[in-house]
Amino acid sequence: MAATQLTASPVTMSARSLASLDGLRASSVKFSSLKPGTLRQSQFRRLVVKAASVVAPKYTSIKPLGDRVLVKIKEAEEKTLGGILLPSTAQSKPQGGEVVAVGEGRTIGKNKIDITVPTGAQIIYSKYAGTEVEFNDVKHLILKEDDIVGILETEDIKDLKPLNDRVFIKVAEAEEKTAGGLLLTETTKEKPSIGTVIAVGPGSLDEEGKITPLPVSTGSTVLYSKYAGNDFKGKDGSNYIALRASDVMAILS
């Protein structure tokens, strides 16, 4: 986020200026009393700080450093699959985009670790990751490679290829009825924390920068932390979740 710097020029006063102030009495300045409840919120001007940093037009490029990547954000869906126009408040925040530039990588121990995501790749990233910037009237995001959930080469989330220590899970269907036979609505259904692993990342990096394979594999039924990861819905209506391997609590069999 761009920082705002405020500067003030030094104030100088001549002897004549000081003389002109002679005779000023404190009683000449009066303040009216303020009764409780008389101050309206509209009398204040709010300072709004946006999350996006605006890059001046004179700059022609942005080069991410270290293990960061620059992503051109995919525009939010303005319509549903049925063609219904969505108001701005109902449009979901995009979690995808195209990698347009990458940093030089990072060093772990004595090993140099390059960015594994190439430019041009279509990616899915963590929902609240990175810093948003506006460049050439287009929204971009600068984030760390570790904030990238996976690569998505199609329009269906089920084809996600997770990166690093991410595990991609198809969530088990929620119970439609209670034990007593009462039909549950979508809002009252309890979110399942069990699912089937459909894809895993290559692994996490150890202290020397070497890849350590994940302890779960494709096809495993797992129990995971209830509030972890990023939730997605496939085109067929199925629910998916992408989370870190450390959020998988157990393998069920």
From Swiss-Prot:
Keyword Transferase attributed: no
Any one GO molecular-function label of the UniProt entry: ATP binding
Induction of synthesis: Induced by heat treatment.
Coiled coil: none
Modified residues (Phosphothreonine): 212
GO cellular component: apoplast; chloroplast; chloroplast envelope; chloroplast stroma; chloroplast thylakoid membrane; mitochondrion; plastid; thylakoid
Tissues expressed in: Ubiquitous. Most abundant in leaves and inflorescence. Low levels found in roots.
UniProt keyword Phosphoprotein, yes or no: yes
Transit peptide residue numbers: 1-50
Ranges where the record places region Cpn-10 domain 2: 159-252
Keyword list, A-Z: Chaperone, Chloroplast, Phosphoprotein, Plastid, Repeat, Stress response, Transit peptide
Protein location: Plastid, Chloroplast
Region: Cpn-10 domain 1, residue numbers: 60-153
Any one GO BP annotation for this protein: response to cold
Oligomer status and interactors: Homotetramer. Forms stable complexes with CPN60 in the presence of ATP. Interacts with FSD1. Interacts with CLPT1 and CLPT2. Interacts with CHLH. Interacts with SPY.
Role description: Seems to function only as a co-chaperone, along with CPN60, and in certain cases is essential for the discharge of biologically active proteins from CPN60. Required to activate the iron superoxide dismutases (FeSOD).
Family: Belongs to the GroES chaperonin family.
Identification of the protein by name: 20 kDa chaperonin, chloroplastic
